[in-house]
């Protein structure tokens, strides 16, 4: 673990495995990892190096142990830590961190946070156990946790249980502060105290489930916020003092333990799960999801700016923008602060995510340059005590070094090490080398002993085999004995060598000490054999102890006499250490190297004798009076050394005695064992002899039996003998062949070694060659990139020079004009000419100003000088005319001064111009480079889409081939054609993959060039500017911005103009095709071949409607209009059906088409403006003509606004007043013609002042009148009743597929549900009431009140005349035949209450009763006998004849939100349910329905969010979801037929069918109604039905009803004339047209 100081941020890269969807779509892997190196390659040769790199197959445990485990250990030492997970959405960040809890997650797949929690509490338990074992006070730990969520730049507390999820958008009270040390902390955050691992895991799970997630096109469950899970660890542990060097310094007596104190360490661990960076066009996010994505990207951008500022190697950036985002503010400690930080960058390996992967790797690469300042979080008292202890230990160590002579002070006062210390270091090094040598020799001796044992055992076995009485047991016993004998022999030799060494040491000590009297006789005692008596050894030890006591007493007397005992003590100790080291080295050498070092021992003994002689002489010379003091000191030192030697000798002798005692015990044990064996053998011998003696008295029969037994055993032994002899021969033969085998083995080994050497050399050569090729290729690529870069620079320079040339030409033109003006000034003129000229100066001045305005921006100063010269000339003329007598001199000087100023400022303007040109070139380079990258990205995306299309087509062909093989295997020609088509598609896919790879390589090269350009920072140029130059640069920037803005506006205007023309051309062609098709249909009855032609065209056009065309109608697809599609290949698919349609229709003979159309028909094929005029005037064609009257009755109308085409310019629309006047004028004409279409839908925002009812209900004082539903004669009560008022047509929606004819108003709050018959309409609202309407009279009949809360569902049973309304957990049953009263109340738990159970409820009920659940929807069986109520996650079945519950449908894990009922062919009910758990389930009920019934089928795959609505027509089921998508299912095959992911911009709330037509209606929360073709599930048109969300939709035989949150129900008519089998492209273009015949 790194200590205190600077610590770089570590970066790890994890590459997730490919998804199955990516594999199916043919995505290639664009990343690779260098084996054994933390390096990842992107594309071909773009390499990134990090601290850790984890490839596709890396497990979670490896990531944790490599990256995070050390950080947890650092937390116990007081270091902060942070783990950051960064990457694009869907890259596996949440999986890596472990915050996405799933029931199916195994232990191996646990993320970083659960593993860190287990590690943390395991470390706490281990430290407490270790302290208990050591007998010290255990540390105390306090763990707390916080869980924050940063959602849309608002900090939310995920542990706050009182927070309402609906208040997510409100501002939180959490504040971020900074303490005195620069640390970041938050206030207002819930901090939970944790006591166990399970408790912390539960808190993590609770917070993770409260986190904001949603589904996008890239990820089913995408994190929509940044999450920060923080663990605070507070540790109070015992801090022991370090062992001081000298006990005298510490002052502690012997046996006193060192004092202990407590220190407090704190640490915090941040686990940061960042939300993924995302592109809106990839995720398909709209509305709230788009806002979340923008907020996420803003936070990550701020984080990137902070990383760039901290990782700047040049240290130019002074300010770090931590406060730009709350995310960077919270992570201020982790980035550049006090924390050990690791960033885990999660990337996708697929080539479709190449740009996101590249940006993530660049992002992470910048983070490696950040340096954090890591310190231990310790309380101040503990820090001060630790610092003082460290200082004391340092000073004590230094003092001991001075005392020991290790450090010395030189003459100049400098510190250094003594020669003794250096000598000791050398000796220690030599000692280490000798130890290694001894160890190696010991291993060699052991190997030799083993070999000797083996050979001797083999020899003994051979001897026994020759004798014929050997077996395996005896051989094993012999081998064990031999091994034991060798071991004992080795130990004996070691003991003898040690004894010899001890004898030599004792003799040296006796020779060196004149005071030892009993040492010499001890040598013969030790010189005996190892079996000498223990009394002799005891006697030697006793004598040595007596000598030791005498020496100690002598030393005490000498110390009393010594005046400098401290100095002597120091010297004696030094000599003692040296002698100990010398003796130890000698003992080890003699013990381990007895064979090699005999001579060296003799020489050592001689040297030692000489040393002892010199020491004796030194002691004997003590009588010299002059050197008495010095000799006295030497004697004292020698005496001290001898005492130590004696002590050591005694210890060695005692150890040797103990070892001998141990050997004696071992020998005695073995002797006893052998004696026991001998005794057992003797007993067995006696027993056998006794048996033999007793055998003589046995009978003949027993003798024969024993004889037979012995003969049998003898035969067996003979067979064993033969086998042993054969084995012996084989053994002899093997011994003979052993030498030959050994020679062959050596030869083969030599050959193998040579081959290995050759292989190594060859591999080395191959590596060198590969490295050389790689270097050459890299060099060539670099040269190519350099050349390309140089070429681009040259092109930019040429462009800049051309621009500079044009500017110079303009300046030259301006100078020429100035020169000509000056020449005109110098030319003399007559008074008449001057008089005429006096009339013209204003024109001349104006012309000069005009010319100045037409030149470039840099020529303005010259233009001003020309105009000043002209004004000067005017003043001179006025002087000649006598107007101004004085200003002659003043008229010429200003011009001269200006020219002087200009000459003085030439150098300044030149320098500023050069700086501006350099900046301009830099800007042009950056713009061109970014444009190139954007174009390459677009090309790569286009290729990826094309590859996906080809893969889908290839899969379809493969399935077709498999089906053809299964049905008719003999069709070889068809199979061959399909195989060829599949091969062609595979070749095309390979070609596209090559193109994608080239794009990736080019992008990488451009990114490298971009980095080089970024290195030349413009700040250097700007910082070197003076104030005047800066003003000039700012002025140039402003002018350039204005010019660019003007160019952009002009381009946009041109684009809009071209788009308008293109739309007009498309609509003209589609109108003509439509007219031709309609004309052909009329003639088709008499011409069968024409019918076949039309059918073929329709089939081909239906087949041509691909998924790309569907995207034109889908708001969430790749584009919202065909003008946004930039690829040429995409445009090829758009019009592929129209030329074929036109060509086939034009090929039909004129006879089939009948008479030609007149001039009024041709007007329809004109532009959109002419069509609008024809429609608005109403006289564009003859209505009397029956042909046109019949054609107009089948008018085609499609939406003009929506997702099909972009909105047209507002400048082309007429004002509302003009349209209202034209509508009023055209109204009488339309009312007289029966052939025209009914009134179209109302405008988007109808005027509320026309509605008397809404004006009256807006007054709160009259709110009580709303509850009156009686038939009073009061006019006020009649007005307050709900009415259905007709709605006039509006031009804005005349081309829509639906036209609003009426509007029902009467509810005061949003309408949630409705049901209708041909005469009655029933509505339920949030105002706790239901209303019944008469569709014939257009009035409200009755109001059904008394509901506890919102009425969420209402159904009418035509068989019984009962109405069922749902509110909270109650179903009210109303009998409308008598007086519209509630006759029964049904509950969700299955209870039946007579009458109205909620009549006493006056206020709105918020909660349900105990045991009850919210009922979301009800449905009636087609026969009217069963009622199905969706309550909770089940559906309760009611039998209406008895009003009793009979069963329950179960199987969902979430609340059932919607259901629908139909009948099968066997007249059984088929119930389909949709739940919040994203699944659609089907239940088929039999005749007897009782108990709990499970689903018969689960429709797969599920939606990405909860199901909101269902609709069934025949065998087709449609389901609409909150994920904005609609799916089409086949009930017979029970499979998914088709799906449109983004059918609407918001939740799909309602589905219904247009009666009698194969058309589906869908409505969403955005208020949009869409019409779909049921057969091929293609859009026909759409209309903005309401400004508020549409909650329900139903139909009857005449009308379509939509209920909305704007408190209204609109009645719609379908506009006839749309043909669902027409090509979608034609239908989409017709949506822009008006009424077409």
From Swiss-Prot:
GO molecular-function terms, A-Z: ATP binding; ATP hydrolysis activity; microtubule binding; microtubule motor activity
InterPro entries, per the entry: KIF21A/B_hel_1, KIF21A/B_hel_2, Kinesin-like_fam, Kinesin_motor_CS, Kinesin_motor_dom, Kinesin_motor_dom_sf, P-loop_NTPase, WD40/YVTN_repeat-like_dom_sf
Recorded GO CC terms: cytoplasm; cytoplasmic vesicle; dendrite; growth cone; kinesin complex; microtubule
Kinesin motor domain span: 8-370
Keyword Hydrolase tagged: no
GO biological process entries: microtubule-based movement
Start-end of Acidic residues biased regions: 578-627
Binding site for ATP: 87-94
Keyword Iron-sulfur: no
Name of the protein this chain belongs to: Kinesin-like protein KIF21B
Gene: KIF21B
């Amino acid at each position: 673990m790194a200590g205190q100081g600077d610590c770089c941020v570590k970066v790890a890269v994890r590459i997730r495995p490919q998804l199955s969807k990516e594999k199916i779509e043919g995505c290639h892997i664009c990343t690779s990892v260098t084996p054994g190196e933390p390096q990842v390659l992107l594309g071909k040769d773009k390499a990134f190096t990090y601290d850790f790199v984890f490839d596709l197959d890396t497990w979670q445990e490896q990531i944790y142990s490599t990256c995070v485990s050390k950080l947890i250990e650092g937390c116990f030492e007081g270091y902060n830590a942070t783990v950051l997970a960064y990457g694009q959405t869907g890259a596996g960040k949440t999986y890596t961190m472990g915050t996405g809890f799933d029931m199916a997650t195994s232990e191996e797949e646990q993320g970083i946070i659960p593993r860190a929690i287990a590690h943390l509490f395991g470390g706490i338990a281990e430290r407490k156990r270790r302290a208990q074992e050591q007998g010290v006070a255990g540390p105390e730990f306090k763990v707390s946790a916080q869980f924050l969520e940063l959602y849309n730049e608002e900090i939310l507390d995920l542990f706050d249980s009182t927070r309402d999820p609906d208040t997510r958008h409100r501002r939180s009270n959490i504040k971020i502060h900074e303490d005195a040390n620069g640390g970041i902390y938050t206030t207002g955050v819930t901090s939970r105290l944790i006591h166990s691992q399970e408790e912390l895991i539960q808190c993590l799970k609770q917070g993770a489930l409260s986190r904001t997630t949603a589904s996008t096109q890239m990820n089913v469950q995408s994190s929509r916020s940044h999450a920060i899970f923080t663990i605070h660890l507070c540790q109070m542990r015992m801090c022991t003092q370090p062992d001081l060097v000298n006990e005298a310094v510490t002052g502690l007596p012997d046996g006193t333990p060192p004092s202990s104190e407590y220190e407090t360490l704190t640490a915090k661990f941040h686990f940061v799960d960042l939300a993924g960076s995302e592109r809106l066009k990839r995720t398909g996010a709209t509305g709230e999801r788009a806002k979340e994505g923008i907020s996420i990207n803003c936070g990550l951008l701020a984080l990137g700016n902070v990383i760039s500022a901290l990782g700047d190697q040049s240290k130019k950036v002074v300010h770090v923008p931590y406060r730009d985002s709350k995310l960077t503010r919270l992570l201020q400690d982790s980035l550049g602060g006090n924390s050990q930080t690791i960033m885990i960058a999660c990337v996708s390996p697929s080539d479709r995510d190449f740009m996101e992967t590249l940006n993530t790797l660049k992002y992470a690469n910048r983070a490696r340059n950040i340096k954090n300042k890591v310190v231990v979080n310790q309380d101040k008292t503990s820090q001060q005590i630790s610092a003082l202890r460290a200082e004391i230990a340092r000073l004590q160590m230094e003092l001991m070094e001075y005392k020991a002579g290790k450090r010395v002070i030189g003459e100049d006062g400098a510190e250094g090490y003594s020669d003794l210390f250096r000598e000791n270091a050398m000796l220690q090094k030599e000692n280490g080398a000798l130890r290694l040598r001894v160890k190696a020799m010991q291993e060699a001796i052991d190997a030799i002993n083993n070999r000797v044992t083996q050979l001797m055992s083999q020899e003994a076995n051979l001897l026994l085999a020759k004798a014929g009485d050997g077996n395996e047991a005896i051989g094993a016993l012999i081998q064990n004995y031999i091994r034991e004998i060798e071991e004992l022999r080795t130990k004996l030799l070691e003991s003898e060598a040690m004894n010899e060494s001890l004898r030599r040491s004792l003799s040296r000590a006796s020779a060196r000490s004149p005071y030892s009297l009993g040492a010499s006789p001890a040598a013969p005692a030790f010189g005996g054999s190892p079996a000498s008596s223990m009394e002799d050894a005891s006697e030697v030890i006793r004598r040595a102890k007596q000598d030791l006591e005498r020496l100690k007493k002598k030393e005490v007397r000498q110390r009393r006499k010594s005046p400098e005992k401290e100095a002597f003590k120091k010297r004696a100790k030094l000599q003692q250490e040296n002698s100990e080291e010398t003796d130890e080295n000698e003992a080890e050498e003699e013990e381990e190297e007895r064979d090699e070092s005999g001579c060296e021992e003799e020489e050592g003994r001689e040297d030692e004798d000489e040393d002892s002689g010199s020491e004796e002489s030194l002691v004997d010379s003590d009588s010299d009076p002059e050197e008495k003091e010095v000799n006295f000191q030497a004697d004292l030192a020698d005496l001290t050394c001898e005492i130590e030697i004696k002590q050591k000798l005694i210890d060695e002798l005692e150890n040797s005695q103990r070892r001998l005692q141990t050997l004696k015990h071992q020998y005695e044990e073995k002797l006893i064992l052998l004696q026991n064996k001998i005794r057992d053998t003797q007993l067995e011998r006696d027993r056998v002899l006794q048996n033999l003696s007793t055998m003589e008295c046995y009978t003949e029969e027993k003798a024969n039996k024993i004889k037979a037994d012995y003969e049998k055993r003898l035969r067996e032994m003979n067979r064993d003998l033969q086998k042993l002899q054969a084995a012996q021969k084989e053994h002899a033969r093997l011994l003979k062949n052993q030498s030959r085998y050994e020679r062959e083995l050596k030869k083969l080994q030599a050959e193998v070694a040579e081959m290995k050497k050759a292989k190594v050399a060859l591999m080395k050569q191959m590596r060198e060659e590969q490295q050389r090729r790689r270097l050459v290729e890299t060099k060539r690529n670099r040269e190519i990139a350099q050349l390309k870069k140089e070429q681009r620079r040259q092109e930019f320079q040429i462009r800049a020079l051309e621009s500079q040339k044009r500017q110079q030409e303009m300046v030259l033109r301006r100078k020429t004009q100035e020169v000509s003006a000056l020449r005109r000034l110098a030319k003399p003129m007559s008074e008449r000419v001057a008089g005429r000229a006096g009339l013209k100066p204003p024109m001349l001045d104006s012309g000069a100003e005009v010319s100045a305005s037409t030149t470039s921006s840099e020529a303005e100063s010259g233009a001003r000088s020309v105009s000043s010269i002209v004004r000067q000339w005017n003043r001179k003329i006025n002087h000649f005319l006598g107007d101004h007598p004085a200003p002659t001199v003043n008229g010429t000087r200003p011009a001269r001064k200006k020219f002087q100023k200009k000459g003085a400022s030439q150098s300044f303007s030149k320098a500023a111009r050069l700086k501006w040109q350099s900046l301009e070139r830099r800007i042009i380079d950056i713009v061109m480079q970014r444009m190139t990258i954007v174009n390459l990205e677009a090309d790569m995306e286009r290729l990826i889409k094309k590859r996906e299309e080809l893969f889908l087509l290839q899969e379809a062909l493969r399935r077709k081939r498999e089906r053809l093989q299964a049905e008719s295997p003999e069709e070889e020609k068809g199979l061959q054609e399909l195989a060829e088509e599949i091969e062609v598609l595979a070749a095309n896919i390979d070609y596209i993959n090559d193109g994608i790879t080239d794009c990736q390589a080019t992008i990488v090269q451009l990114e490298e060039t971009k980095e080089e350009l970024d290195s030349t920072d413009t700040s250097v140029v700007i910082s070197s500017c003076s104030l005047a130059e800066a003003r000039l640069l700012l002025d140039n920037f402003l002018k350039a911005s204005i010019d660019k803005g003007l160019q952009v506006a002009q381009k946009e205007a041109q684009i809009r103009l071209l788009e308008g023309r293109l739309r007009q051309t498309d609509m003209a062609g589609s109108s003509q095709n439509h007219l031709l098709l309609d004309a052909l249909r009329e003639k088709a009855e008499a011409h069968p071949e024409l019918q076949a032609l039309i059918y073929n065209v329709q089939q081909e056009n239906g087949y041509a409607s691909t998924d790309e065309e569907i995207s034109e109608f889908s708001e969430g697809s790749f584009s919202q209009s065909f003008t946004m599609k930039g690829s040429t290949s995409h445009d090829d698919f758009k019009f592929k059906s129209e030329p074929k349609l036109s060509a086939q229709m034009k090929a039909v003979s004129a006879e089939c088409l009948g008479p030609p159309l007149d001039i009024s028909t041709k007007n329809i094929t004109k532009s959109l403006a002419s069509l609008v005029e024809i429609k608005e005037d109403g006289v564009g064609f003859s209505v009397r003509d029956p042909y046109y009257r019949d054609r107009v009755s089948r008018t085609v109308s499609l939406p003009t606004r929506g997702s099909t085409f972009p909105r047209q310019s507002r400048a082309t629309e007429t004002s509302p007043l003009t349209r209202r006047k034209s509508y009023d004028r055209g109204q009488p004409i339309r009312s007289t013609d029966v052939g025209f279409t009914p009134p179209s839908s109302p405008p988007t925002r109808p005027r509320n002042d026309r509605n008397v009812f809404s004006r009256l209900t807006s007054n709160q004082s009259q709110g009580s009148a709303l509850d009156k539903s009686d038939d009073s004669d009061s006019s006020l009560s009649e007005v307050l009743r709900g009415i259905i008022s007709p709605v006039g047509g509006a031009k804005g929606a005349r081309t829509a597929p639906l036209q609003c004819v009426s509007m029902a108003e009467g509810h005061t709050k949003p309408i949630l549900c409705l049901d209708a018959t041909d005469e009655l309409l029933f509505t339920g609202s949030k105002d706790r009431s239901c209303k019944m309407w008469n569709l014939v009279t257009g009035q409200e009949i009755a109001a059904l009140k008394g509901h506890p809360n919102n009425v969420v569902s209402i159904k009418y049973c035509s068989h019984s005349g009962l109405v069922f309304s749902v509110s909270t957990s109650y179903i009210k049953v109303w009998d409308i035949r008598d007086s519209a009263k509630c006759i029964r109340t049904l509950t969700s738990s299955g209870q039946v209450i007579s009458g109205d159970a909620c009549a006493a409820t006056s206020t709105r009920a918020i909660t349900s009763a105990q045991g009850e659940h919210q009922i979301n929807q009800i449905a009636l069986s087609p026969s009217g006998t069963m009622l199905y109520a969706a309550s909770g996650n089940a559906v309760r079945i009611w039998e209406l004849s008895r009003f009793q519950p009979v069963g329950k449908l179960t199987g969902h894990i979430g609340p059932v939100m919607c259901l629908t009922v139909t009948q099968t062919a066997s007249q059984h009910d088929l119930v389909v349910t949709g739940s919040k758990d994203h699944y659609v389930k089907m239940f088929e009920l039999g005749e007897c329905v009782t108990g709990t019934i499970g689903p018969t089928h689960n429709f797969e795959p599920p939606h990405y969010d909860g199901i909101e609505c269902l609709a069934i027509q025949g065998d087709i089921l449609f389901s609409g979801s909150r994920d904005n998508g609609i799916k089409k299912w086949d009930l017979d095959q029970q499979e998914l037929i088709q799906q449109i992911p983004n059918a609407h911009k918001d939740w799909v709330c309602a589905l219904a069918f247009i009666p009698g037509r194969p058309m589906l209606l869908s409505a969403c929360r955005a208020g949009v109604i869409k019409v779909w073709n049921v057969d091929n599930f293609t859009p026909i048109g759409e209309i903005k039905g309401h400004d508020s969300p549409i909650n329900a939709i139903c139909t009857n035989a005449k009308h379509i009803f939509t209920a909305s949150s704007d408190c209204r129900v609109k009645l719609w008519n379908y506009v006839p004339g749309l043909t669902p089998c027409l090509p979608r492209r034609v239908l989409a273009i017709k949506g822009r047209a008006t009424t077409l015949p």
